[in-house]
Amino acid sequence: MRRHPLLWKLALLQVGFCLLLTWLIYTWGLSVERSTYFLAPADRHYLADYARQAEDAWRREGAAGAERFRKELSAKEDTWVALVGPHLESLGSTPLSAEESSHLTFMRKLDWPMSRRLQDELPYVSIEFPGHPEQGRLVIQLPERLLPGGLTPWTHLVTHGIVPTLLAALLGLLLYRHLVVPLNRLRDRADALRADELESTPLAAPLAARRDELGELAQALEHMAERLRLSLAQQRLLLRTLSHELRTPLARLRIAHDSELPPEQLRQRLDREIGDMQRLLEDTLDLAWMDTERPQLPTEPVLALSVWEALRDDACFESGWDPARLPCRLGVDCRVEVHLDSLAQAMENLLRNAIRHSPEDGTVSLDGEREGDFWHLRLQDQGPGVAEDQLERIFLPYQRLDDSAGEGFGLGLAIARRAIELQGGRLWASNGKPGLCLHLWLPAAA
């Protein structure tokens, strides 16, 4: 079941954008709008000074002073004014009417936002006496000239138009960088492959390392490019090697054809040369198939001892060796999870190679032990061994050491390694004491 990480990334990005836009409009935008409804510091000081003057008049002259100041301020600002006590009673000589008392039901302080009330009525501001706030306050209907202007069309455009547009543009940029830029790189890479530019610069590591569909696509594209490079290299190597390797048997066939050998000897010579060419072609096709197709081979539990015994019988028949020279120290508990035919082919190549390089009275043995979920098998011969710097070279196709020129085509070990690796195992070599030791690392059967 696919998790669709790219879908979740895009969904999360869009949800985050919607939440940010909602916060912008309903929190930041409203906060900016509310900030335009507060009195300016100078206006606050101006009204607070009226409260100080009202307190002074009331304390000096009592109700008469409060009434006089109320009338003067009302006439000066052309607005409604009242001086009230702690219980909202009038401090002047004129009591408040019912309508005037209704103005006191919702009064605003100087640091509150100011806006028109219902029916376009100016707000009423309550300003406590600065000296003794518990004894009274000045209540004044805010003069028209002091009413804050509120949200201007330009501010509204910035908070509800320009900034959201910039956020939308930022979202588009993020989507472009997250989607379009990688797609452009993938397109350029595909165009390079279409133009046979197989050695062009591979995709950047961050793109191939992405844990989403685009990262998987980049990995698949690079895998395809690598397969194409390997296929092309193998084709070139195949053509170059076949053209070189076939020259020798063809030349020998030409010599045999032109010679005056007896018919029976000529037939044997032709059979040997044709067999060599057939073996070369079969091995080359096997190696090319494993390298290019990389098949998923079905596996089964296999008893390693049984495979060795079958190979030993064939090897003894072909080489004339005594079976005692091919001992196996594995028990019936050595069961590996492999493809039987591929393992048999690989071990046959290894055994033939070991016999070919063994001395006349030498032995080739097979032993091993289980290490965790794998079996570590060792095929040991008593031949001359291989130089340390050549231990990896012997597994390369068509590679023959100087002292083995003319023996085989250099494909046996390469085919064996490919066959083992296709089954999840490993094959490597080390020098024994004496001879060469070939190590097989195979999955253990459950």
UniProtKB/Swiss-Prot annotation:
Cellular localisation: Cell inner membrane
Domain Histidine kinase: 241-446
Species the sequence originates in: Pseudomonas aeruginosa (strain ATCC 15692 / DSM 22644 / CIP 104116 / JCM 14847 / LMG 12228 / 1C / PRS 101 / PAO1)
Phosphohistidine PTM positions: H244
Domain of life: Bacteria
Keywords: ATP-binding, Cell inner membrane, Cell membrane, Kinase, Membrane, Nucleotide-binding, Phosphoprotein, Transferase, Transmembrane, Transmembrane helix, Two-component regulatory system
Periplasmic side, ranges: 31-155
Any single GO BP term: phosphorelay signal transduction system
Keyword Signal: no
Protein's UniProt name: Sensor protein PfeS
InterPro entries documented for this protein: HAMP_dom, HATPase_C_sf, His_kinase_dom, HisK_dim/P_dom, HisK_dim/P_sf, HK_sensor, HK_sensor_dom_sf, Sig_transdc_His_kin-like_C
GO cellular component: plasma membrane
